[in-house]
Amino acid sequence: TDVPESADWYNSSYIIAWGSNVPQTRTPDAHFFTEVRYKGTKTIAITPDYSEVAKLCDQWLAPKQGTDSALAMAMGHVILKRFHLDNPSDYFLNYCRHYTDMPMLVLLDDRDDGTTVPGRMVRASDLLDGLGESNNPQWKTVAFSTAGELVAPNGSIGFRWGEKGKWNLEQRAAGQETELTLSLLDLKDEVAAVGFPYFGGNENPHFRSVPQQPVLIHRLPAKRLTLASGESRLVVSVYDLVLANYGLDRGLDDENAAGDFSEVKAYTPAWAEQITGVPRHHIEQIAWEFADTAHKTHGRSMIILGAGVNHWYHMDMN
């Protein structure tokens, strides 16, 4: 398991104990979990059984065993819709720009059926003159600035060898301050049909499946680049790939995207309710509270992840 240090639990304003039975498996640390509630921190237990940690929490969600990933995907769907699309959180968006690969560009690979799939990252070496990057351009990822220019922001792996003092992730390129673009929605040249694998329809003796196509085609804003080789390729941002994978409607005529939480499409709360057994309004509530607290406190929401969710295949992918 990989969780915030127990002494840091007291700094949190919202804690989810996900598959971690703190009083039983972390007895010496359990007092931090109970004491933090005295300052108003809300605690949530996510575990199929009413374990010891559930009695220490304000609310208990009981997904069917092995369905934690479905619950997590639905919570992510709610958070992305509420805090990235409906009412964008400056704190969340700035965090994504500074500390994640979400602004980076990904090449789309063509399929025989006319659709595409995500390929590898775009590198500075793919572009004419390598964006002026002479040191390790094959290892430097690329993004668009808000001015619509291609840049190689500081901090990717290519900056960590041969260039002193460029280890930190920064919104800088060629020595200049720059703000990175997360989505290509306003810069797009065309809308690409991109395939994503779907595993929620696989039959399982322990919980219900929700049959859909094994490959879900989503429509993403894409930009066409001419590479140094002369080849013309479509690229998308990691951010747009994430939003599409979570099934969020971007107004691009995407029939597999959901515009409402009540639609039974991957990965809405209504979809997750059928698989996990957790009422969708509880999924919406906990996801919103967790993210809203993080938004207002600049990150004081924590998840204590227990080994219990790893006892099923792929549960460590939450």
Where are these regions (language model features)?
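Short acidic, glycine-rich surface-loop motifs adjacent to enzyme active sites
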Residues: 11-23
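Acidic catalytic cores of enzymes that act on phosphate-bearing nucleotides/polynucleotides
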Residues: 282-285, 291-318
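Glycine/threonine-rich flexible loop motifs
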Residues: 22-33
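Anionic-ligand anchoring segments at beta-strand to alpha-helix junctions in alpha/beta enzyme folds, i.e.
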Residues: 1-11
